[in-house]
Amino acid sequence: SLIGKPPIQENYATYWSTSSFTNEQWKKLIAVYWGYTAMIDFEIGRIMDVARELGILDDTAVFFCADHGEFTGSHRLNDKGPMMYDDIYNVPFIAHIPGVSTVGRSDAFVSLIDLPATVLDIAGLDTSLVEDGRSIVDLTRGEDVEGWREDIVCEFHGHHFPLQQRMLRTRDFKLVINPESINELYDLR
C-alpha cells in the first residue's frame, strides 16, 4: 500500500503500477525481465568458458554488479521509480578474486564506487588514487575490515519526471529525504 508514503509514489503508480497494465502486458513484462536475466547469465557463462579455454580463468578476477534493481511487480509497481526500496537499491555485487576470495557472502555495505579501488588493489596499485571507494578485497577473504562503512548513501535523480531523493541506510534505520515532499524514516529492527 502507498498509504502514508510521499505523494510522488502514488503519482508514479498512476502510470507504472500493476493496475496500469493488462494481465497480458504484465506477462510480457515479466517474461522480458526474466529473458534479459537469462541472457545476461548465458553471456557471462560464455565469457567464463572462453577464459577457461584460454587457460586464464584461474588468473582472472570476475565482478558481477548492477546499478539498480527492478520492481517487476513488487509493491505492485514496475520499473525503477522514485521509491527507495531494497528491490531497487540492494543489488548484487559479486566478486571472485582467484587466490583471494574465500567467502560466499558478506553483509557489508558495498557500492559501485568500491570497484575502482578493488581493481587497483588486485593490480597492486595505490588504492588512494580513488578518493571515494574502498577495496573489497579483504571482505572477499572474510576478514573484518577496520573502519568499514556502517551506512550507505543512495541517490535518485529522476526517472520519467524530475525528482531528487537521497537515502541514508544503516542496519537499523533508513532515512529517505524527499526535498519536494515528506521525508521517510523506517525502523528496520
Regions found by a protein language model. Name each.
Residues S1-F109, I122-L129, I177:
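Active-site-proximal cap/lid insertion segments
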Residues H68-S74, I113-P116, D121-L188:
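C-terminal cap/loop subdomain of S1 sulfatases and analogous C-terminal strand-loop tails that border
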